[in-house]
From Swiss-Prot:
GO CC terms in record: cytosol
Function text: One of several proteins that assist in the late maturation steps of the functional core of the 30S ribosomal subunit. Associates with free 30S ribosomal subunits (but not with 30S subunits that are part of 70S ribosomes or polysomes). Required for efficient processing of 16S rRNA. May interact with the 5'-terminal helix region of 16S rRNA.
Subcellular location: Cytoplasm
One term of GO molecular function: ribosomal small subunit binding
Keyword Cytoplasm tagged: yes
Originating gene: rbfA
Superkingdom of the source species: Bacteria
Subunit organization: Monomer. Binds 30S ribosomal subunits, but not 50S ribosomal subunits or 70S ribosomes.
Name of the molecule in the record: Ribosome-binding factor A
Keywords: Cytoplasm, Ribosome biogenesis
Family to which the UniProt record says this protein belongs: Belongs to the RbfA family.
Region: Disordered, residue numbers: 117-138
InterPro entries named in the record: KH_dom-like_a/b, RbfA, RbfA_dom_sf, Ribosome-bd_factorA_CS
Amino acid sequence: MAKEYSRTQRIGDQMQRELAQLIRREIKDPRVGLVTITAVDVSRDVGHAKIFMTVMGQDSAEEIAQTIKVLNSAAGFLRMQLAREMKLRSVPQLHFHYDESVVRGAHLSALIERAVAEDGQHQEGPASADAKPESTEE
C-alpha cells in the first residue's frame, strides 16, 4: 500500500502553519504587510523549502519585491524559530517566492464573468426582437 501523504508533504504543511504564526508574531518590519503562506514545497532531501506567499494590500511589484527581500533576509531567524517549534533533525533552508496563482485566478475569474455578461447581452438582444407580442384578448 503506497503512502498517500508523504513525509515531505507533512513537513511542508506543518511549516506552513508555523511560518504563518512566526511571521505574524516575530517579524515587525513595516515593509512586510499581511503575509499569507499559500504553500510550502519541501525538497525530497528536506534540505530546501520553497515558501509561496501572497501579500494583502500590496499590489505593486516593488512592494511585493521588498516584502520578499525582507523575508528572505529574515530566513535564518525564521529557520531558527522553526527549529524550536518542529521536531526535525535538520530544518530546511527557506526560500520565499511570490505566489502569482491567486492574482492569475482573480484575473481569469474576471475574464470569465465579463464573457458571461457579454454572452448574456448577446442572448437578450436577438431573443427580445424575435419574441412575438402576447395578446391580451381573452
